[in-house]
Amino acid sequence: MNSSAVHTPVDPKQAHILVVEDNVSNFVLIARLLAFMGVQKCEWKTTGWGVVDFANTMSRVDLILMDLRLPHEDGYDALRQIRIDPRLQNTLVVVVTAHGSTTEMKKAREAGFDGFLTKPLDADQFPEQIRQILSGEPVWELGI
């Protein structure tokens, strides 16, 4: 999110979330956890390539959960495209990665991501992490 932008809190039950994840099992877990929270809309894209065009087909996007290691265009490349798109530039974009390290987290923060979650996701903590993110509170966690 643009550092000068103010995030308007979003109720998870009204949220429109785009998950950019190439692993079907990971997407299914995320989608089920979001559905359990009552998230209104969850869309899935398997690569960073074309993520802006895809997101612009959605009526709105409140949050993008982005894997870093993706085919064709990684999460960092996709984020750069998102940040220059007038409609999406202030959208919250949070890393969800299996490559959790302090170095990767620092790189993600410097690149302009709005948060960092590591896989495997903790099914007990994930709903609260998403609530925090949607309310405008950053979540930067390496997990276990």
Task: List each language-model region with its residue ranges.
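Two-component/phosphorelay signaling modules centered on CheY-like receiver
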Residues: V24-E43
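Conserved acidic carboxylate
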Residues: E21
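Non-catalytic signal-transmission and effector/linker regions of two-component phosphorelay proteins
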Residues: M1-L18, A31, D124-I144
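A Lys-centered signature of the CheY-like receiver
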Residues: K119
